[in-house]
Amino acid sequence: MTTHLVWFRQDLRLHDNLALAAACRNSSARVLALYIATPRQWATHNMSPRQAELINAQLNGLQIALAEKGIPLLFREVDDFVASVEIVKQVCAENSVTHLFYNYQYEVNERARDVEVERALRNVVCEGFDDSVILPPGAVMTGNHEMYKVFTPFKNAWLKRLREGMPECVAAPKVRSSGSIEPSPSITLNYPRQSFDTAHFPVEEKAAIAQLRQFCQNGAGDYEQQRDFPAVEGTSRLSASLATGGLSPRQCLHRLLAEQPQALDGGAGSVWLSELIWREFYRHLMTYYPSLCKHRPFIAWTDRVQWQSNPAHLQAWQKGKTGYPIVDAAMRQLNSTGWMHNRLRMITASFLVKDLLIDWREGERYFMSQLIDGDLAANNGGWQWAASTGTDAAPYFRIFNPITQGEKFDREGEFIRRWLPELRDVPGKAVHEPWKWAQKAGVKLDYPQPIVDHKEARLRTLAAYEEARKGD
């Protein structure tokens, strides 16, 4: 008898799942599903408790949905990726599996694991799929068959390639001929978990699809005008579903073009499309430059920057107590919700690296440990952009002023007051420099003074980067 095994990883959905669809194509095959939890590996990769909670909930939803299709989900737990190789081999042997289907992951450890699995399954046909991207790595290359290192040329080539052939979404599988089955007992991950707002980050696949549809209908067209202002609900909030595979990027693309057909030609919706392409860009980069997975800077000379070791400053940044309101409000949003507005990710990253001169990798790790939408490629790409260490990054002399950033993107201080209750009584725009208002008003605030002087910090950072660059 032909037995197909679908190995789920970061693709926890029925709709538009390339590996699942391929496994179910043969209507006479027996289809099984497998998920392997690797808590120790997750801890090494700084997975956040909120993301673990989301995955746990999605797994239980997936188990029920698969059972309705007649597909049992086998759940196993081992320490790490190395141990998972033996589990796949064991499950295949116990169930006389003839074909293994899985969706590629592009990180170094994951790719090494998959190579070992295929090597161990000599009598099993293994098929992998580029499911987590719209266009696979290698599909968008320069004329010299090299990976693009600058986003805009990559984007232009990506759009050109897309117009040559739009990847379709595949349907959810039909019920197997054997009929529905009873789902197994609920899954509980052996990993720290923390609750989150399911209204913002839906657990059920159908709710994520509905959120995507709602955003593309009502938000994507105004995204360019709304996306930079954290007090406004101007972003999609779909990043967590994309990170865990509750949604596919193809679903996002097709829904966007269905609601905003001019997005491909620079019209309404095109800026959100650019965000999807940035996601592709960082994944393609990570595939071609695996050192990015190992926290190495893309620009080699930046590894010579003499970072400051200052635990007190790092902790103040982490806790949202730097004395700079927009930075602190953003960090408290992150700590309270597991999510941070994208503009604020840029501001807080710039502050850590270029005001405090703390190694960007400290920030990269902390973000991963808190974010419900933690994604190695996107998080690393964002931090290397802010630190001027990455490809197509901000130049090292571009240093955000945390006061003017607050004035520009939270003009009236609405977002700041939402997350810093100790500043609610500071009037108007004075909230961006509350220490000045407090001094004039003769008021003592329960809020710290700035931990660094921005002008002095800027000069110190410029000197550190210029010194590092001398040896280049």
Name these PLM-found stretches.
Residues M1-M166, A463-A468, D472:
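Trp/Phe/Arg-rich N-terminal binding region typifying the photolyase-homology
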Residues E233-E422:
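Active-site-proximal binding-pocket segments
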